[in-house]
């Protein structure tokens, strides 16, 4: 049931041969589990029990979780831990962390406790802007695109007033809009580049909705503009960017070297010297930088997941930022002040 019958299926010998399942999304949760157990788990008598024991006893809560994604059969749990002792800008806070890797929460807590008596963590918000683009193709003259943008800009912005109203009340909304000529990188490629302030929200839905409206208005204005010698610009896609080099926070800690003490037989001075050199190596050597930054993201991802945010977006943006000058580098710097 639910399987295409009477057909010949070819497969590599290293894979299990089985017919493709059809209308899988239409099967009930129980039927999906039956299929999984029969096709992939050797009809194990304990497999169904293992899957169902991770269901939430509260059916309403389980239904809520099932609705987050598609074709769900069970829940995948992460340990949800707490890292206390964090003194951030003179405010003592406890950090939630959801991660399956051992020692990450312990290391964060230990580091926080060390810095607690040494001024804690200091932050500097360098920027909070996010961006998105309407990607366009136009194979006429660049001067024609410039003239069209001048013709359309006011109405492009006016068309966003209703979408931006709620975000503006919170001090956010679209900040700037510009036409960017990318034809040196790709023939005929232009973009409308928009920057946004989304306050405490990641703002993905808001940004995408705004960009889609820009694309709709752009198509309308293009049909009214008489200055194109070629076809009108074609909208390829309208979407936010997870690369946010203008949304950056610096975090720093500092103390005297003699406060480090001896660590596993290594003097504080030697430890600090080697620590700074290790960071310098990660700054110039991508092989080291990747693992160095992975360790940093252990903690960041854990907080992002624990707070219900999109860790894939953060990961993508962070690693792009680490490569912003053309080479992948360390996200951190260490300096010994004489």
Place the predicted regions along the sequence by residue.
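Acidic/polar, glycine-rich intrinsically disordered N-terminal extensions of enzymes
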Residues: 15-93, 97, 101, 121, ...
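Conserved alpha/beta core surface patches that mediate binding of polyanionic ligands
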Residues: 66-78, 109-121, 158-184
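Short glycine-rich or small-residue beta-strand-to-loop segments that form or flank ligand, phosphate
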Residues: 69, 91-98, 133-140, 191-201, ...
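Conserved phosphate/anionic-ligand binding catalytic regions in large, soluble enzymes, centered on
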Residues: 80-107, 199-207, 283-308
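A structural-propensity feature for long, helix-poor, extended segments
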Residues: 121-150, 322-338
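Intrinsically disordered, low-complexity linker/loop segments enriched in Gly/Pro
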Residues: 139-215, 286
């Amino acid at each position: 049931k639910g399987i295409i019958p009477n057909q010949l299926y070819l497969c590599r010998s290293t894979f299990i041969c089985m017919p493709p399942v059809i209308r899988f999304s239409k099967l009930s949760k129980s039927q999906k589990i039956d299929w999984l157990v029969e096709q992939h788990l050797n009809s194990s008598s304990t497999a169904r029990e293992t899957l169902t024991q991770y269901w939430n006893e509260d059916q309403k809560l389980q239904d809520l979780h099932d609705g987050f994604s598609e074709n769900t059969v069970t829940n995948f749990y992460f340990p949800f831990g707490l890292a206390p002792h964090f003194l951030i800008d003179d405010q003592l806070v406890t950090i939630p962390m959801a991660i399956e890797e051992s020692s990450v929460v312990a290391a964060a807590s230990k580091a926080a406790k060390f810095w607690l008596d040494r001024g804690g963590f200091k932050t500097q918000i360098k920027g909070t802007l996010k961006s998105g683009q309407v990607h366009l193709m136009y194979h006429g003259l660049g001067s024609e695109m410039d003239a069209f943008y001048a013709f359309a800009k006011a109405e492009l912005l006016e068309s966003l007033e209703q979408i931006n109203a709620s975000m503006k009340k919170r001090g956010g909304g679209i900040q700037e809009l510009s036409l960017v000529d990318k034809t040196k990188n790709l023939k005929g490629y232009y973009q409308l580049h928009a920057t946004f302030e989304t306050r405490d929200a990641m703002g993905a839905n808001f940004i995408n909705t705004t960009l889609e409206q820009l694309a709709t208005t752009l198509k309308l204005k293009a049909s009214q503009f008489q200055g194109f010698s070629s076809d009108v610009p074609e909208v390829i896609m309208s979407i936010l960017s997870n690369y946010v080099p203008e949304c950056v926070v610096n975090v720093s800690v500092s103390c005297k070297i003699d406060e480090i003490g001896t660590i596993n037989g290594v003097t504080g001075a030697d430890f600090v010297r080697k620590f700074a050199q290790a960071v310098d190596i990660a700054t110039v050597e991508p092989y080291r930088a990747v693992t160095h930054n992975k360790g940093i993201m252990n903690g960041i991802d854990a907080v992002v997941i624990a707070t219900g945010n999109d860790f894939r977006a953060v990961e993508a943006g962070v690693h792009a930022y680490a490569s912003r000058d053309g080479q992948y580098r360390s996200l951190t710097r260490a300096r010994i002040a004489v």
